[in-house]
Amino acid sequence: ETAAEKFQRQHMDTEHSTASSSNYCNLMMKAREMTSDRCKPVNTFIHEPKSVVDAVCXQENVTCKNGQTNCYKSNSRLSITNCRQTGASXYPNCQYETSNLQKQIIVACEGQYVPVHFDAYV
């Protein structure tokens, strides 16, 4: 799995325009293999066409959380869902809180149009 493929698996959900129910994160985190060996504590899904997310790589250049300079912030707010593990849940029964948001996203890119890491939303 390449970094770009991993980004697609962990962060892209183009089929849904928003999280359909409060159970969305529980289902999606499992379906996208983020609970197979541990519970990934936090993850964000983006409900926009791939072309829209790829285009962020040519928008505002910002510094990533880790200090690298290959992060880019979207010009507009995008439809995203944030999944956060609930305090009471433990592997293998990972449980998540689902939050629907409209936020600008920050992604790290390789080359001109290849998002490889979700850094933050603002």
From Swiss-Prot:
| Top-level taxon | Eukaryota
- Do you know which Pfam families this protein is assigned to? RnaseA
Expression across tissues is:
Pancreas.
GO CC annotation terms, alphabetical:
extracellular region
Q: Where in the cell is it found?
A: Secreted
EC number(s)?
Answer: 4.6.1.18
Gene Ontology molecular function terms on file:
lyase activity; nucleic acid binding; ribonuclease A activity
Fetch the CDD domains from UniProt: RNase_A_canonical
- Catalytic residues, per the record, are H11 (proton acceptor), H117 (proton donor)
**Chief place where the protein resides:** secreted
Entry-linked SUPFAM superfamilies: RNase A-like
- The record's disulfide annotation reads C25-C83, C39-C94, C57-C109, C64-C71
Q: Where does substrate bind?
A: K6, R9, K40, P41, V42, N43, T44, K65, R84
Entry keyword Lyase: yes
- Reactions catalysed, as given in the entry: an [RNA] containing cytidine + H2O = an [RNA]-3'-cytidine-3'-phosphate + a 5'-hydroxy-ribonucleotide-3'-[RNA]; an [RNA] containing uridine + H2O = an [RNA]-3'-uridine-3'-phosphate + a 5'-hydroxy-ribonucleotide-3'-[RNA]
Per UniProt, the keywords (alphabetical) are:
Disulfide bond, Endonuclease, Hydrolase, Lyase, Nuclease, Secreted
Any keyword Hydrolase?
yes
Subunit structure as annotated in this protein's UniProt entry = Monomer. Interacts with and forms tight 1:1 complexes with RNH1. Dimerization of two such complexes may occur. Interaction with RNH1 inhibits this protein.
> What function does the entry list?
Endonuclease that catalyzes the cleavage of RNA on the 3' side of pyrimidine nucleotides. Acts on single-stranded and double-stranded RNA.
What's the protein name? Ribonuclease pancreatic
Report the source organism: Notamacropus rufogriseus
